[in-house]
Regions:
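Substrate-binding surface in catalytic domains of secreted glycosidases
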Residues: 2-138
């Protein structure tokens, strides 16, 4: 069911995304050479490790000007275990009433997700620290 799965993908799409960005970068650079401009290429990228694993983080960070890492919506009304917590907490909250064990790796044992853990995961996957922009809720 493609509609219910968010953004369905096949195994080839991880590399295809990198190839798409590389082609866009090449075309933008060619146009920039012609009109003496630099055209920005950015990508909004996910926080969850299960989603990050579908991106070639190191190669993508070398292609784009920066990645807008979507470090928000960590908690919300969809949770059934109680009150919602921070939308975009900087560090893990040991008192989070709704730990998510499915997210326990590479995040702490209680499954709590945080901006610090997301950024550390991107760095571990080869992202350039200069290419990470964190997106926060407003």
């Amino acid at each position: 069911d493609e509609v219910g799965n968010g953004n369905p993908h096949g195994p080839q799409d991880t590399h295809n995304f990198t190839l798409l960005l590389q082609e866009l970068r090449s075309q933008l650079d060619a146009q920039g050479s012609a009109d003496r401009k630099h055209y920005l290429l950015t990508a909004d990228t996910p926080s969850g490790p299960e989603k990050v694993s579908h991106i070639e983080v190191g190669p993508v960070s070398r292609i784009v000007d920066w990645m807008n890492v979507m470090t928000f919506d960590f908690n919300g009304p969809w949770e059934t275990t109680g009150p919602t917590e921070s939308q975009s907490n900087l560090f893990p909250d040991p008192f989070d009433p709704a730990p998510r064990p499915t997210r326990s790796k590479p995040y702490p044992d209680n499954g709590e997700i945080s901006v610090a853990e997301v950024v550390a995961n991107y760095l571990a996957h080869g992202a350039s620290p200069r290419k990470i922009a964190i997106s926060i809720p407003f």
